[in-house]
Design a protein with these regions (language model features):
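Helix-loop-helix
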Residues: 1-225
Length: 225
């Protein structure tokens, strides 16, 4: 790992271990699990302004869909002209077609930190205390293929699947009548990618995915009302 990345990793490690130490008298062996959930919720709370902006961007994009379709049909044979017209339309409307990706992009550094903290035996020059934490008896630093058949794997897999199902329903609800069968199929299946991704990550990262996707579902449900 490049040396300039060691500082944020060490900082995150000391924050997380301090939180674990503070709550361990009350939570016992689940201190690391609760610390991951608390930190994830804190990050998502800080990202609420971006989520609100993304929601407004998605609504604006939905309103622009008829105009976007007309431009696509009109300039189908001239990609350069189409790009210029799309950029002009976005500038006039004050929105961006990529606004919906802001919360996801902003979470990437935190996700990388979580993966790094629970996949290394040594952090900040000392033995990693975090990987000794466990969930239903399964160490947080182990990967899911090793945990197949254990209660931790089964519970987390079921919960991720349930959250993905709700996420797919919300995604389908956001599509309008112009949506193609392919886009509907993608919206229905894409949320289950978190379940597939978690299979190749440490258990702690799977817990992070469960927490953040559950937050996303709750947040979108509230914003769509």
């Amino acid at each position: 790992m490049p040396s300039f990345l060691e500082a944020p990793v060490a900082g995150a490690y000391h924050v997380l271990t301090s939180l674990v130490t503070a709550i361990e008298p009350l939570t016992g062996s689940y201190a690391a699990v609760i610390a991951i959930v608390v930190c994830t919720l804190a990050v998502r709370l800080c990202l609420v302004p971006l989520s609100l902006r993304a929601h407004r961007g998605l609504r604006a994009r939905a309103e622009l869909m008829p105009a976007l379709k007309k431009l696509s049909d009109r300039h189908r044979g001239d990609p350069e002209r189409l790009q210029r017209e799309l950029a002009k339309l976005q500038a006039e409307s004050g929105t961006s077609l990529f606004a919906g990706f802001l919360p996801t992009l902003a979470q990437m550094p935190f996700f990388w930190l979580m993966y790094t903290l629970f996949s290394r035996a040594v952090v900040a020059g000392e033995l990693n205390q975090l990987i000794s934490g466990s969930l239903l008896g399964a160490p947080l630093g182990l990967h899911w293929p090793v945990l197949t058949g254990t209660p931790a794997f089964l519970v987390l897999a079921v919960l991720l699947a349930v959250v993905a199902w709700f996420s797919a329903r919300l995604a389908l609800r956001q599509l309008d009548e112009t949506a193609t069968p392919l886009s509907r199929r993608v919206a229905r299946l894409l949320p289950y990618g978190t379940l597939l991704s978690a299979a190749f990550l440490p258990l702690a990262a799977g817990l992070y995915l469960l927490t953040t996707t559950a937050w996303t579902v709750a947040e979108r449900t509230i914003l769509q009302r």
